[in-house]
């Protein structure tokens, strides 16, 4: 039991008690909704039962569920109502008949129009939904192709009968109508340019020939000497004959020296005696400085024994000769190999 020692039993409580399920709960004796519930008897069969009263339905929603549906709305487990059907009603859809796949739609030896109409009635059942036209068009195309084959075969047979009959036969085209290919005629080759000396001599009457014309022996008959080149020596009248040629020039007499053979006189070099003030060696005419001056080397004497060298300015370094143990005396007037710091002497 709950006991409250701070407050007396006669004092009223300031707290308002509410049922746990809310104000609509029937724990504290609240009123129940007067709408009847639909009780489903799942064990009883309702095949032959009468339809229920459509007016007696529970359309009242409890709590927040009352805002979900307005009016007669299906419950869970039932088919939802499409908004398009609710606004515009049930759409009218044409019934598409099934195709008979066991029956062939290609006619052979029948009237094409009647078969096409019958096939259209069979396949479409009087309705057209835009799909059965392909079958009818295919059958019509096949039937038209068969009809064309029949017509072509019939026309061919008629043509054969007419050609084999006693009618007037068409004359075959003669082969002479096609002109033969013309024979190729090669153009004549033009003759090459012939010189006057190649032409044969011919006689023609031209009248009297002057006496000073010695080139002609007969009338209009050219001498062979006239038909040769102008430098021929047989024709004295030609200006370029061998008789009128100038004498051969004396080719042994030189006309003049070629410029390559002309040599200029040697000039005396004035810089041979010039010397370099730093090294004291001559420049040998090279005053420009492009070539290094040659260093004079004295190669007299034996560098090992010191024999053959001339006495120079370092004679004061020469010591007295001594013959210790018969060793030869080495001339000290030269620089030992490697310098004085080598320690050889």
UniProtKB/Swiss-Prot annotation:
Molecular function via GO: microtubule binding; structural constituent of cytoskeleton
Ranges in a coiled coil: none
Chain positions with Phosphothreonine modification: 35, 92, 96
BP GO annotations: positive regulation of microtubule polymerization
Basic and acidic residues: compositionally biased ranges: 78-87
Keywords, in A-Z order: Cytoplasm, Cytoskeleton, Microtubule, Nucleus, Phosphoprotein
A cellular component term, taken from the record's GO annotations: cytosol
Transmembrane segments: none
Region feature Disordered, mapped onto this chain: 1-34, 78-100, 127-241, 300-345
Main subcellular location of this protein, as a coarse class: nucleus
Bias type Pro residues, positions: 177-191
InterPro entries in UniProt: JUPITER
The keyword Transmembrane helix is annotated on this UniProt entry: no
Subcellular location: Nucleus; Cytoplasm; Cytoplasm, Cytoskeleton; Cytoplasm, Cytoskeleton, Spindle
UniProt entry tagged with the keyword Kinase: no
Residue positions, PTM Phosphoserine: 24, 105, 134, 145
Comp. bias intervals (Low complexity): 132-145
Domain of life: Eukaryota
Sequence ranges of Polar residues compositional bias: 1-14, 146-164, 212-226, 315-326
Similarity comment: family membership: Belongs to the MAP Jupiter family.
General function of this protein: Binds to all microtubule populations.
Name the UniProt record assigns to this protein: Microtubule-associated protein Jupiter
Species of the source: Drosophila erecta (Fruit fly)
